[in-house]
Structure formats: structure tokens, C-alpha cells
Amino acid sequence: MRAFWQELEAGPVLQVHQAGEVPYRRAWAWQQVRLAQMIRDPQVPDGLLLLTHPPVYTLGAGADPKFLKSLAGQIGSPDTQPESPVTEGPEILRVERGGEVTYHGPGQWVGYALLNLKRHRTVYGSHGQPDLHRYLRHLEEVLIQTVAHFGLQGERIPGLTGVWVQGHKVAAIGIKVSRWVTYHGFALNVCPDLAAFQAIVPCGIPDRPVGSLVHFCPEVTMAAVAPVLVKSFCQVFGLQAQEVSLSEWLGERKSLKTQG
């Protein structure tokens, strides 16, 4: 992975931490730590957290619970522990991001992008400020370039957010921005259990099926996709990846390398 990233030209640093399977609440807390640091200190580099989650359903801040269909369970919040232990099925959490309900689980790469948009002129609009629609299109481009590496043509659908392959949605995006620092991000279906999506109306879109890369490219693996995602992210945003430990990503200790 390091060698693959090193093919990139030098640019501002993107500190990348690739974790294994991380519970949603824990990953959410990691984002809050990094977000607070980036708001407090504009010199903190951009960061990308790449991981998978155990099964969980999340709703955006304004999501309609009707898209949970018949899914039963208390809707919780990532900043509070459930009143009683979850014994059956995935948790259901309402979070700050935009968008409707989605599913996260094994076989899906989730990327949490913490970027200071003030540093990214390519997402600026004509009004001289960062444009969140442009940022969303940049995230889509990351995913389109990623699937293209595996011989697949990723597509946008006007009026919707995400990436489709042959009419199947393979990537979902949901973001939140605080003082021009982004958090939350994207989810790319590599080889998840798609049956988990049948319990909901994914992203509130009833007439668009969900798909996965392995359906179109049977030999694809999670391990093969991860470095391509990172490289595509860096190419689209003009950054250079720097692999860091979790403690470095959280700012608990300084990285030995702070500039690419």
C-alpha cells in the first residue's frame, strides 16, 4: 500500500489511518476528536479514516423514519449508550450527516473524510466560498475513479448523490460540515451482504437497486480496493497520503513526517 501511494506527486498531506472493523460509535467519536482539532488549529492536516463497521443502520439528521420500513428498534444517537444492551440485530442510529437511511457492514469500505475546505480551491464556487455541491461531486469522482480501476464505469444520476454501476447504486455519500471542516463521508459496497439493504429503502430511493463491485467484478477484494480508494482520493483532491497510526490520526502524538 505504501508503494502504491508513493506513486503520487507531492502535495499537501492527507493523514490516512486504515483500521479494521470498528463499531460505529467509536469511529464517530474518533471523528469528533479530529474535527475539534482541525477547527481549533487550521494547521492540522486533512485526514481520512478508512474502515469497516459491524452491521448498523444510520439515518441522516433529517431522514424520514418511514424508510426503515418494518425495521424495529429504538433509534439511538452515537454520543449516548443504549439504555439496554442490543441483543438482536443491528443498531439504528441517527447522525448529523445529510441524506436518508443507509446500512453499513462487513464487505463495505467506509471513508470518513475530514478536510478543511478553505484549503481546497477546486471546490470553491463563484461566490468565493467552498461549494458543498462541488465537494459532493469531488467525492463522487473519487469513487468513479476507484471503480474504473477495476474496469467498471461508475455513473452519476442527475438530482441524486452517489455512484451507480449499470443502474445499481454501489456507493453512498453523506456529509456534515462545521466551520468548513468536513466529516462523515462515503461508503463503497465491495462485497457486503446486500440482503441487509432489503430491510430499508436505501437513501430513500425506492426504485434504484443497491449493488456491489463483486457482482460486476467477481475477483475484486476489499484488500485490493483500499489502496485504490486512497490513491483516487489524493488525485481528486491534490493531496499526498501519509499513513499514520490511530494515535497520530487523533493527534495524541506527532507524526514523524508532517509534510509530503
From Swiss-Prot:
Catalyzes the transfer of endogenously produced octanoic acid from octanoyl-acyl-carrier-protein onto the lipoyl domains of lipoate-dependent enzymes. Lipoyl-ACP can also act as a substrate although octanoyl-ACP is likely to be the physiological substrate. The record marks K169 as: Lowers pKa of active site Cys. It is an enzyme of class 2 (transferase). GO terms for cellular component: cytoplasm. Belongs to the LipB family. Pfam families: LplA-B_cat. It comes from Synechococcus sp. (strain JA-3-3Ab) (Cyanobacteria bacterium Yellowstone A-Prime). The active site is at C203. Residues 42-241 form the BPL/LPL catalytic domain. This is Octanoyltransferase.
